[in-house]
Amino acid sequence: NIVGVATAIVSGGPGAIFWMWVMALLGMMTSYAENVLGIYYRRKDPAGGWRGGPMYYLRDGLGGKPGRVLAVLFAVFCALASFGIGNLSQLNSIAGNLQAAFGVPEAVTGAVLAAVSAVILLGGLKRVAAVAERLVPAMALLYIVGALTVVGVHITAVPAALAAIVKGAFGLQAAGGGIVGYGLSRAVTWGFKRGAFSNEAGLGSSVMVHAASNVKEPVQQGMWGIFEVFADTMVVCTLTALVVLTSGFVEPDTGRIAAGAAGSALVGQAFDAVFGTLGSKLIAVCILLFAYSTTLGWSCYGCKAVELSLIHISEPT
């Protein structure tokens, strides 16, 4: 939502944001479908709670040996992904930004977060949910208010930024020497990559948590899937893009990064231009909250994947 959007602009130009929006529109549909299926095919566990996810709707929906094989494969790959997309990349962003903003050694950050994570995760899904329901609104509000302030200061540059996004999406801008790989292909590639990485729509991972919801109607949970993709990409990621493109560190007409700008650190530099040195510190805190909440969520996904593949996939259909 923060670093990823800046990277997309650096690597694919402003047009990458347009294709990120396209990915979000497609993602709303896939998120709706996977969450409806997750509720429809979920089952009661011995404790009276709900368990479900792609393993269940692949196994029970497709049926037979192909369904079981795909269910187990999903669980294995989801467990592996929890160490990559859900852990290593997130903690690397946290440690790097805290070291740059506050001088905290990366090893210290890793040790502290590991200890705190252990305490939270040992409490199970309910404790993770309790932490997330307090953390997510606070972090979203903090970042959105900060981003709106930056965009408000540069409000006159917003039309040019939006025009750059549309022109860049179809390769209509002049090539900029400071950008890595301009043109339609790069814009589409980076827009779709960062869109999928941002909202996870279609990956099936978040369905395991959605399936535990106390709702009776599958469509209701499917609508929540649509909303979370919209809020994540269309609101937060778009704000990040406008922060970067209106800051003066990227030339809207060419997409070229201005001299002295630092690629993936563009968001922090844009905040510094408005808030002074407090800006990069604010971004470091936002990245800490965003990335750490992602780590907690993916830790649950990994545990659920292992649990459901080793224990529940073998139960009768």
Where do the protein language model's features map onto the residues?
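Extracellular loop-to-transmembrane helix junctions
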Residues: 10-48, 232-239
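Membrane-interface alpha-helices at helix entry/exit sites of multi-pass transporters
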Residues: 14-21, 60, 65-73, 110, ...
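Selective recognition of specific alpha-helical transmembrane segments in multi-pass small-molecule
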Residues: 26-33, 111-125, 136-156, 189, ...
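Helix-loop-helix module between adjacent transmembrane segments
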Residues: 26-48, 54-55, 59-120, 286-296, ...
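Extracellular/periplasmic helix-exit of transmembrane alpha-helices
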Residues: 34-42, 148-164, 172, 176-182, ...
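Hydrophobic, membrane-embedded alpha-helices of multi-pass small-molecule transporters
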Residues: 70-91, 109-114, 149-163, 167-217, ...
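Membrane-interface loop-to-helix entry segments
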Residues: 74, 91-98, 105-166, 303, ...
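Residue-level detector of conserved catalytic or cofactor/ligand-binding positions
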Residues: 311-317
